[in-house]
Amino acid sequence: MINRRHALGLFAAASFLPSRSFANVSYQRSEFRDDLAKRFFDLGTVGTFVGYKVDDYLIIASDKVRSGEGKLPASTFKIPNSIIALETGVVEDPDKDVFKWDGVTRSIEAWNKDHMLRSAIAASAVPVYQEIARRIGQQRMQKYLDLFDYGNRDIGGGIDQFWLTGNLRIDPIQQIDFIDRLRRGVLPVSKRSQELVRDILPATKVGDATIRAKSGLLGAEQGKPSLGWMVGWAEKGSQQTVFAMNMDVRDPSQIPARMTVTQQCLADIVAI
């Protein structure tokens, strides 16, 4: 049987995308779909969507170029940050350990209060996760990003900024590879940490399907959004599809479109 990471890696190679640390074993099927690319054109922006129908080893993408371009992960990094926090004991219980508000009033009201890990990931509370990263520290953070083979694994630019304004980059194929391993519980950390993070991921019901996903938005805290992400997986009956979407956000009115266009693309590939 073909390993899922191998299938993703060969998709990257066959698509003439930048090389990654995936083994060179044949994948089964891949498709590029113009109708997915049109979703971004209709929004008046550019972006990419990649869906991975795991039971079929079928990878469906909107393009061959942007799907292999590394970007700052923004708040999608809250997923690995949460795993590392639990694994290192920085957080023991996502529903009990309290991160006190620092008293600084920020433009996003949901950030201006105390949080636990579950509420912090739901509110995408950047200050909480910056404090988590500081408590994890440079050495442990680097250790786990290396273990996860997460993006370019470069945490330069500050322990509380590297995923927002620093050196970390990840592309949609790499996002899918990481998310799929979390979904299956095969990351090189405890089952408990992975189960808890799967449980706290925001979930959205769409008909008889469920989307478990984390958004990201570069520039959110400055009120100057520039890049939007949505990564996660969709469940419909026994069918599961891992996905990653990113798009240029050219106007604040496009911020909600991160989920809208993701749902449209998932529907287009019959994942929801």
Model-predicted regions and their roles:
Residues H6-S26:
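N-terminal export signals
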Residues F22-L72:
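Beta-lactamase-like hydrolase cores
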Residues V25-A37, G70, R134-G137, R183-I272:
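Structured C-terminal helix/loop/strand segments within mature extracytoplasmic catalytic/sensor domains
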Residues K64, V98-V104, G156-L164:
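Short linear capping/connector segments at secondary-structure termini
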Residues G70-D95, A120, F243:
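Active-site SXXK
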Residues L86-G103, V189-S193:
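Short, well-structured active-site flanking segments
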Residues L86-V90, A122-V126, A133-Q138, D146-Y150, ...:
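Sec-exported extracytoplasmic/periplasmic mature domains
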Residues E109, K113-L117, Y129-R184:
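Mid-domain, small-residue-enriched loop/turn segments at the edges of structured enzyme/sensor domains
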